[in-house]
């Protein structure tokens, strides 16, 4: 799921679980980010997360459905089945990257930060990562 804010100049990858409370806290912090592109990789590792991930993935507007759930608690509805092999691929790639905690952030410079960050720390890391590229 790709979320462009402002000019989208700074980039960030987010590995996140739809049932993770720390992920939801991070999402609330990220609302204030400016001029960033966030690549959201849904990684269902907690109980009940796989069905939610599929419902979000199969929705007509993934980003809206994701934000409705993560920020507002609106349960994603599974309207129809769709190809969810991307979710399987995300899971396989995270194993290769040894990502087993959500949330996990990867910045443009390759720095990996597991856990929740404040908006100030997110901005700081995004700025630093952009300067090294």
PLM feature segments, named:
Residues 61, 82-85, 117:
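Short coil/turn linker and secondary-structure boundary residues
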């Amino acid at each position: 799921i790709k979320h462009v804010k402002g000019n989208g100049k700074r980039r960030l990858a987010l590995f996140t679980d739809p049932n993770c409370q720390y992920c939801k806290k991070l999402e609330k912090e990220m609302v204030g980010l400016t001029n960033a592109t966030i690549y959201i990789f849904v990684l269902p590792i907690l109980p009940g997360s796989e069905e939610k991930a599929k419902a979000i993935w199969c929705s007509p507007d993934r980003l809206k459905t994701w934000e409705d759930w993560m920020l507002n608690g609106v349960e994603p509805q599974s309207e129809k089945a769709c190809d969810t092999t991307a979710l399987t691929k995300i899971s396989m790639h995270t194993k290769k990257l040894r990502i087993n905690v959500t949330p996990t952030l990867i910045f443009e410079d390759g720095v990996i930060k597991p856990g929740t960050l404040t908006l100030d720390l997110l901005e700081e890391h995004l700025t630093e990562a952009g300067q090294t590229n």
